[in-house]
């Protein structure tokens, strides 16, 4: 079976012969007996200058061809044993007149037996390789469909020659080469060809029977495998003897598998030996998979150019010999297609003797992302395809697959390789011109004239085209001339003649060297291989140096000779040592305008190398030599070499060395070459180094300059002895300790790599985009969170630091994303690098400051309260951005090219400036951050072991958590930046670990964004709460998101009775887009039903709404951040503390009376007072129509009159009770009384609750007025106060509804009259008077007292005028919309009213007056003002002593209650109008007479005029200051008391000047039954230095220890109605009045509650009230629902 595997046919190859005949002579062709002439090609003309040119004429054309030469010659010689043809124009014509022509014929002598069965078309010569038609003649490769299918393993090689010889015709194709016909017969015998060099090439063929497997018809070779070792088995090439017999088993159509190798440069031989390669035929599919011989016989490894192509076990695989380089033209020669691994050899172009060769190699194609699928298919089709051995597939396209279809089946790995001509130009090293050969012969003659030879050489090199061999000959002649002149100069006795002869010789030599360096001769240099180029360049430099020193040695006195030609400036200087005063500089500025290069030799170095008192120096400057003396791996032209080295892998016999070289950077010679010598051919070491200034030829896309010199021994550039002193974008300064030829080498940034992203693969690029996008999104969310939810945070230094860190990180991410897309030539590249440098320095500095801030917090009083430290933050800003900008500016001044000469637009160039201005500052900041973090951790450990207060422990835990998060943040950011840096550096050096760094950067950068969002946003409880509030308040969000049941984590007080909310309290959902102050109320009844009791917990949760009241202060008052806790309590004096529970943050419960362990400076603190709940009405059923609205349903027994609810008439079990709530903000007490604190001016008095900050120096207060919404089931919102004026009526009579209709009309008229807020405010005071009057009547009835007479009627006029002036400029920025007041009810007709109480800090409620910043002494420097203000101070002082500690520490102790009872018994000082009246005058008087009332009215009138004048002068003054607001609030409090007293006098009630109105601090103690009055609740907050509002540095000089006045609310009293909203416009009021339903129930203005048969003593309901002030000056109030 072995004989069936392959059949080898061996026969003698026909000889290939060439015959020539000069013009005018006969061409005779003869063959041996039995052989006939078989012409291959012929031409009458001239292709070579050496043939038939005895006189060396070089003017003849070498591209002379007669197209019909072969036809004419065939007519005379074809199929003849011999013939003779005259080479004359009469026979062939004259294709090129004036040129001496010759006739050239290529033929074979074949046997007569073969000619009877074959055609007359012969095969082309070996170097023509025209085996098939060029399908894609693109010059780089082509498909040659010669063989489809092949043996497994080695595969059958295509025949070098066609199987049948034929006549090559030139008709119609314009050339000498035709396509051979289909091969249908056996291969021809061997033939020999006579090459120009006289060598013969043996050609032989053999055929092999092949079978095509059914499963594969493409016959493509297997993918090649690159190996760097050669221990694989290769098929042997064995010589065989020619034989004319063809075995019977052979197939006539089977192709030959013998590979014919040419002798030059390939793997063949030159001795005519037949080389054959054995291979196995393909097996059938059945045997290919199962035969045991597949692994042995069917395995072969081919080695081409040291590339091992392993095709073991792959059926139907051919080897790489089916790949060909396409035909092309180069150096006036046509290079036909050549098989990979072969060398195409042909004679040199006309006018030159020798041979030219060019090799076809297989190169690896670098992946190009710009190729799409179609381009790759076409590229694969046009470059790599196997030869077909099937005659049917060769010329019958119907039986073969199309080429594109075959390309689809090409293995992907093989498609990465393509056949390429190597090197880029043909090798013409052996081509020499005839005239230079003549000069070489002349210079070697003994009596030749050296001057004449030098002149001829300069003329020839300037006018003639040279080839690679000519360069070698020319430089050799230059050296020979100098050597001969050295001996011949002695024959000239005259010194002047000697110098003249040598100078003329030097001029010719310099001119010749300039001609060789000229641009027109660049192709001649490229004809040489790299080694020969370097050798020729070295020979040229040494030849010039030898000739120059020949002249220098001849000169015996001081002289300077300059030889200047186009490309060379040569200066020979002979200097006397005594005349050398300074350094010698070359060249002069006017001598060499081509370049600004400069070389400076120090004087000491010259004197050391003097001889005989003379110093001989040779300077030379070259132009265009830099394009010749290129560094290794860059011996081609610059533009081509970039693409060549980057995009191909040269697979040659020295591929091992080349593989390592390709990993190196591409370097160019980036300066002109300049030379200085002190001795001929010697590298003289100098005691002092020379200085060179070299100008950069290329300033863009170059980096890393290196000073080098040309080493004559190694023929290469070397940096030994030279160093770079300084460099910039255009010049470099070098220092060398020896002399020779110098230049600058620089790295080239590949222009084909347009940006950094071109270095990424597809996945890497996508992942980087995603990672940066994620990080940017989360950073933006963090910044928006800090800005939108600004009030959640204390305006602290830490918050400012993190905002700046986020801004820097955002800038870094965006600049990096923009920079990796930019090219190095982009104008934005330098700017991006500069700003990125600044952003990184700023970011690292902020990290350092964050660590330092944590350290300073732990080592100072800031541990207790984190506040905004503006001076410190300003220092951080200055150090961070100022220092970063300064460093970048210094870097730009020192070396601007640092930002533009790097490979990528996101890195600086790695030089000294980079390490000094980037690496060093970043390391310093990072080390400082680590150091401060370590110190902070030590301090925390020490503090945790010491005894601290609860608040300090809380704050310490917060700081500990911040430091941990910051340290993790620091580590993560360091990992991101380090990964990015190493990835960029690795990508530049093409390291294998680059991908690891890239994916590390992607992962760490994504984690950085997630970490910012989670640990800096989500983990913050306050931000989570703000997120929920933000979702609920925006109507554009889905309702399912806005109306979700929510329980906040703020502090809530659960009373001792039932839950906070009633049953079925429901959920809360905001219906207004603006921030509103509202509190939905539920019910709070005693539950006897077990099911209702189980619902209390859920109702309580629903009643606690985190965003129920979030109105903000006006802009003028927005900076009043009060570090306050939340004080809650009942409306009764505290008597018991049992059963009270506080709902802490995090939904944890604890007992009251203790500080919250998790509270901090910005959290809530709960302090409350409590009285056991008295008799409660039965629990009723609660309904709600809208999410933020609670209605209720009356229990069985029918609807009661509304008058009962207003006046507390009827049974106490069914009447909801309301008391007066007074909210005041004041300072925290100082724990160390009498001790002066930092930031204060003196001792700080006590205040209601403990201080949160030891540096609180002054008080601040904000007045809160409650607004009420009264609704009734089944109707729209009612007016807010008119019902209190109506008498009670039976609810079941018809007259009741008639009276309601009349009252509705009265209300409309009354409401129209209230056209301004001034009238409305007056009505507030009027209603307050009714409540107080009713209380006094009840008290006096119980005590048997009589009513006092009413004041005169004229007092009302004064009151009305003053009130209108006082409230003229009141404004509001937090109006409640109509939708809030006009909500209906679903309670039905049997329901009762529901009061929803909303506590707000609306500016309209706070009554801000726009008056000037006046002095208190100036304002009250009269009898009226002084008395009022002094009386106010007395009231404040009394209030301060009364409340100073009553609600401290979160509980009310028995000691505080005793102090409070003691303060209740103190007399109240009365008001007087005189200026010199003391504050404590008449303190024993408890009532006033009518005369005193009248006198007080006159005082009020005068005071009104005084304040009116102040108001008129207030406009145009600066904004309100803290001191101004304090005075205004004091005036406001006094004004309200005066207004209340006017209402008393207007209605004839006795005026008690020492009694405050209901709702004020002193009104609580003024009644006869103080236990029935509501307890006073104070929401107190300490103001630290640096808070948002800012602490008052000092109190007023007149009252340094007096507490600020208590600002009363418009109290509704135990029997009063709800008050109208103070910020509603008249238009809104009218709209509400039009929507009134006829079911409203009111009563007359006369108070008749004492006559009601169902009236009961006033019942005081226990209602828990909690208010929380966050950092945004937003008060969140939670009021226990009213009882039903």
Swiss-Prot record:
All copies of domain GAIN-B, residue ranges: 559-752
GPS: region residues: 707-752
InterPro entries given in the database record: GAIN_B (IPR057244), GAIN_dom_N (IPR032471), GAIN_dom_sf (IPR046338), GPCR_2-like_7TM (IPR017981), GPCR_2_extracell_dom_sf (IPR036445), GPCR_2_secretin-like (IPR000832), GPS (IPR000203), Lectin_gal-bd_dom (IPR000922)
Subcellular location, principal: membrane
GO biological process, one term: cell surface receptor signaling pathway
Sequence positions bearing Phosphoserine: 1156, 1247, 1254, 1315-1316
Ranges of Low complexity composition bias in the record: 381-391, 1298-1314, 1328-1348, 1631-1654
Residues in compartment: Cytoplasmic: 787-799, 848-873, 940-966, 1016-1684
Domain of life: Eukaryota
Acidic residues bias: start-end ranges: 1476-1489, 1499-1512
Region (Disordered): 181-300, 370-391, 1080-1100, 1228-1255, 1270-1353, 1441-1520, 1587-1669
Disulfide bond entries: 707-734, 722-736
Gene Ontology MF: a single term: carbohydrate binding
Family that this chain belongs to: Belongs to the G-protein coupled receptor 2 family. LN-TM7 subfamily.
Subunit structure: Forms a heterodimer, consisting of a large extracellular region non-covalently linked to a seven-transmembrane moiety.
UniProt-recorded name of the protein: Latrophilin Cirl
């Amino acid at each position: 079976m072995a004989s069936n595997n392959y059949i080898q046919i061996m026969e003698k190859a026909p000889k290939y012969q060439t015959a020539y005949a000069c013009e005018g002579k006969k061409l005779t062709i003869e063959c041996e007996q039995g052989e006939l002439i078989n012409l291959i090609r012929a031409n009458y003309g001239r292709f070579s200058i050496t043939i038939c040119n005895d006189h060396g004429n070089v003017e003849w054309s070498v591209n002379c061809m007669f197209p019909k030469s072969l036809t004419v010659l065939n007519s005379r010689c074809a199929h003849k044993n011999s013939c003779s043809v005259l080479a004359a124009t009469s026979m062939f014509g004259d294709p090129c007149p004036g040129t001496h022509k010759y006739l050239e014929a290529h033929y074979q002598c074949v046997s007569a037996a073969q000619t009877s069965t074959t055609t007359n078309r012969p095969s082309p010569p070996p170097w023509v390789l025209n085996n098939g038609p060029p399908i894609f003649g693109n010059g780089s490769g082509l498909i040659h469909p010669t063989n489809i299918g092949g043996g497994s393993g080695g595969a059958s090689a295509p025949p070098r020659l066609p199987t049948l010889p034929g006549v090559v015709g030139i008709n119609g194709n314009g050339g000498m080469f035709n396509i051979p016909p289909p091969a249908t017969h056996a291969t021809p015998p061997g033939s020999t060809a006579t090459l120009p060099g006289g060598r013969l090439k043996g050609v032989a063929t053999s055929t092999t029977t092949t079978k095509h497997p059914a499963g594969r018809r493409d016959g493509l070779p297997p993918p090649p495998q690159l190996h760097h070792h050669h221990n694989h088995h290769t098929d042997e090439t064995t010589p065989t003897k020619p034989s004319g017999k063809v075995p019977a088993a052979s197939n006539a159509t089977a192709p030959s598998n013998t590979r014919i190798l040419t002798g030059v440069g390939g793997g063949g031989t030159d001795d005519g030996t037949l080389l054959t390669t054995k291979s196995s035929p393909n097996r059938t599919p059945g045997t290919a998979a199962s035969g045991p011989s597949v692994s042995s016989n069917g395995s072969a490894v081919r080695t081409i150019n040291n590339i091992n192509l392993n095709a073991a076990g792959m059926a139907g695989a051919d080897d790489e010999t089916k790949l060909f380089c396409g035909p092309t033209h180069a150096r006036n020669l046509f290079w036909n297609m050549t098989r990979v691994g072969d060398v195409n050899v042909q004679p040199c172009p006309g006018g030159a003797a020798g041979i030219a060769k060019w090799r076809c190699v297989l190169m690896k194609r670098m992946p190009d992302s710009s190729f799409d699928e179609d381009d790759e298919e076409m590229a694969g089709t046009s470059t790599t395809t196997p030869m077909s051995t099937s005659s049917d597939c060769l010329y019958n396209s119907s039986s073969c697959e199309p080429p594109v279809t075959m390309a689809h089946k090409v293995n992907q790995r093989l498609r990465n390789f393509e056949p390429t001509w190597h090197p880029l130009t043909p090798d013409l090293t052996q081509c020499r011109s005839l005239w230079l050969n003549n000069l070489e012969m002349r210079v070697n003659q003994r009596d030749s004239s050296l001057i004449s030879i030098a002149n001829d050489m300069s003329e020839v090199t300037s006018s003639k085209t040279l080839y690679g061999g000519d360069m070698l000959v020319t430089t050799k002649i230059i050296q020979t001339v100098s050597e001969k002149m050295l001996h011949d100069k002695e024959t000239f006795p005259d010194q002047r003649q000697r110098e003249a002869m040598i100078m003329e010789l030097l001029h010719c030599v310099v001119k010749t060297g300039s001609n060789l360096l000229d641009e027109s001769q660049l192709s001649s240099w490229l004809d040489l291989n790299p080694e020969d180029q370097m050798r020729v360049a070295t020979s040229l430099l040494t030849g010039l140096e030898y000739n120059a020193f020949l002249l220098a040695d001849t000169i015996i006195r001081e002289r300077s000779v300059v030889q200047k030609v186009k490309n060379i400036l040569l200066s020979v200087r002979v200097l006397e040592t005594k005349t050398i005063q300074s350094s010698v500089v070359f060249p002069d500025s006017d001598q060499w305008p081509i370049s600004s290069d400069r070389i400076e030799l120090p004087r000491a170095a010259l004197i050391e190398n003097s001889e005989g008192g003379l110093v001989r120096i040779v300077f030379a400057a070259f132009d265009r030599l830099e394009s010749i003396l290129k560094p290794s791996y860059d011996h081609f032209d610059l533009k081509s070499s970039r693409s060549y080295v980057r995009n191909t892998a040269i697979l040659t016999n020295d591929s091992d060395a080349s593989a390592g070289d390709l990993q190196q950077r591409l370097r160019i010679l980036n300066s002109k070459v300049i030379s200085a010598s002190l001795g001929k051919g010697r590298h003289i070491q100098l005691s002092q180094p020379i200085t060179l200034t070299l100008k950069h030829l290329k300033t863009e896309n170059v980096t890393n300059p290196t000073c080098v010199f040309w080493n004559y021994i190694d023929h290469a550039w070397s940096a030994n002895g030279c160093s770079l002193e300084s460099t910039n974008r255009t010049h470099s300064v070098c220092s060398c300790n020896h002399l020779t030829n110098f230049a600058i080498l620089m790295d080239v940034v590949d222009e084909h790599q347009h940006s950094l992203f071109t270095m990424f693969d597809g996945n890497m690029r996508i992942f980087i985009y995603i990672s940066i996008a994620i990080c940017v999104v989360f950073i933006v969310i963090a910044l928006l969170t800090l800005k939108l939810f600004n009030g959640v945070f204390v305006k602290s230094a830490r918050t400012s630091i993190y905002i700046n860190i986020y801004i820097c990180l955002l800038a870094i991410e965006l600049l990096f994303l923009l920079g990796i897309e930019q090219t190095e030539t982009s104008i934005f590249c330098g700017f991006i690098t500069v700003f990125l440098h600044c952003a990184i320095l700023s970011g690292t500095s902020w990290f350092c400051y964050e660590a330092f801030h944590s350290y300073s917090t732990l080592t100072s009083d800031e541990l207790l309260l984190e506040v905004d430290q503006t001076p410190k933050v300003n220092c951080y800003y200055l150090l961070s951005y100022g220092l970063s900008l300064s460093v970048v500016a210094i870097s730009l001044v020192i070396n601007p090219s640092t930002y533009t000469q790097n490979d990528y637009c996101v890195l600086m160039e790695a030089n000294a400036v980079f390490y000094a201005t980037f690496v060093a500052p970043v390391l310093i900041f990072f080390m400082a951050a680590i150091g401060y973090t370590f110190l902070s951790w030590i301090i925390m450990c020490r503090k945790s072991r010491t005894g601290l207060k609860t608040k300090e422990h809380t704050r310490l835990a917060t700081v500990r958590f911040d430091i941990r998060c910051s340290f993790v943040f620091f580590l993560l950011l360091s990992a991101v930046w380090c990964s990015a840096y190493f990835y960029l550096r690795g990508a530049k050096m093409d390291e294998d670990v680059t991908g690891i760094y890239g994916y590390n950067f992607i992962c760490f950068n994504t984690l950085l964004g997630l970490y910012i969002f989670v640990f800096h946003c989500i983990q913050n409880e306050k931000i989570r709460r703000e997120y929920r509030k933000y979702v609920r308040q925006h109507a554009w969000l889905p309702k399912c998101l806005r109306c979700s049941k929510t329980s906040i984590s703020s502090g809530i007080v659960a009373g001792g009775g039932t839950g906070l909310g009633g049953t079925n309290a429901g959920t809360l959902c905001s219906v207004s887009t603006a921030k509103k102050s509202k509190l939905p109320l539920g019910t709070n009844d005693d539950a006897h039903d077990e099911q209702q009791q189980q619902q209390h917990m859920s109702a309580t949760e629903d009643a606690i709404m985190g965003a129920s009241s979030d109105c903000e202060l006006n802009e003028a008052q927005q900076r009043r951040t009060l570090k306050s806790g939340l004080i809650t309590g009942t409306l009764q004096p505290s008597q018991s503390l049992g059963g009270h529970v506080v709902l802490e943050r995090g939904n944890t419960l604890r007992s009251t009376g203790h500080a919250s362990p998790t509270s901090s400076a910005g959290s809530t603190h709960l302090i409350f007072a409590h009285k056991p709940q008295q008799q409660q009405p039965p629990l009723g059923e609660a309904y709600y129509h809208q999410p933020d609205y609670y209605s209720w349903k009356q229990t069985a027994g029918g609807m009661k009159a509304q008058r009962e609810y207003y006046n507390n008439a009827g049974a106490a079990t069914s009447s909801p009770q309301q008391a007066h709530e007074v909210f005041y903000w004041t300072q925290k007490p100082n724990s160390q009384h009498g001790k002066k604190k930092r930031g204060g001016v003196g001792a700080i008095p006590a205040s209601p609750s403990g201080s949160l900050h030891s540096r609180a120096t002054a008080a601040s207060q904000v007045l809160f007025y409650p607004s009420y919404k009264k609704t009734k089931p089944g109707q729209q919102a009612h007016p807010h106060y008119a019902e209190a004026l109506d008498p009670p009526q039976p609810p079941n009579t018809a007259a009741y509804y008639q009276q309601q209709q009349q009252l509705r009309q009265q209300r409309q008229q009354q409401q129209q009259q209230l056209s301004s807020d001034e009238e409305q405010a007056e009505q507030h005071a009027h209603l307050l008077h009714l409540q107080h009057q009713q209380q006094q009547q009840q008290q006096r009835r119980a005590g048997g007292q009589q009513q006092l007479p009413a004041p005169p009627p004229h007092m009302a006029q004064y009151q009305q005028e003053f009130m209108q002036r006082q409230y003229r400029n009141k404004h509001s920025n937090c109006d409640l919309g109509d939708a809030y007041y006009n909500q209906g009810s679903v309670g039905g007709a049997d329901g009762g009213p529901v009061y929803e109480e909303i506590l707000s800090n609306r500016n309209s409620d706070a009554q801000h007056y726009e008056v000037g910043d006046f002095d208190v002494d100036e304002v009250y420097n009269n009898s009226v003002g002084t008395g009022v203000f002094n009386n106010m101070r007395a009231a404040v002082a009394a209030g301060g002593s009364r409340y100073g500690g009553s609600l401290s520490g979160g509980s009310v102790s028995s000691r505080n209650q005793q102090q409070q009872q003691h303060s209740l018994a103190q007399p109240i000082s009365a008001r007087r109008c005189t200026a010199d009246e003391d504050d404590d005058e008449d303190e024993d008087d408890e009532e006033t007479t009518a005369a005193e009332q009248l006198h007080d009215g006159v005082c009020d009138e005068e005071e009104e005029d005084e304040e009116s004048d102040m108001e008129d002068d207030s406009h145009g003054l600066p904004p309100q200051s803290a001191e101004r607001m304090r005075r205004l609030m004091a005036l406001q409090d006094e004004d309200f008391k005066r207004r209340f007293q006017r209402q008393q006098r207007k209605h004839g009630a006795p005026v008690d000047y020492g009694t405050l109105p209901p709702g004020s601090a002193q009104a609580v103690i003024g009644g006869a039954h103080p236990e029935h009055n509501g307890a006073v609740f104070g929401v107190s907050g300490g103001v630290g230095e640096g808070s948002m509002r800012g602490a008052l540095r000092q109190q007023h000089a007149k009252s340094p220890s007096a507490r600020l006045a208590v600002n009363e609310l418009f109290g509704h009293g135990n029997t009063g109605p709800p008050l109208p909203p103070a910020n509603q416009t008249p238009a809104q009021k009218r709209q509400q009045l039009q929507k009134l339903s006829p079911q409203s129930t009111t009563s007359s203005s006369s108070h008749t509650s004492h006559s009601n048969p169902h009236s009961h003593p006033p019942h005081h309901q226990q209602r828990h009230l909690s208010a929380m002030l966050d950092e945004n000056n937003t008060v969140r109030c939670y009021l226990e629902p009213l009882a039903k």
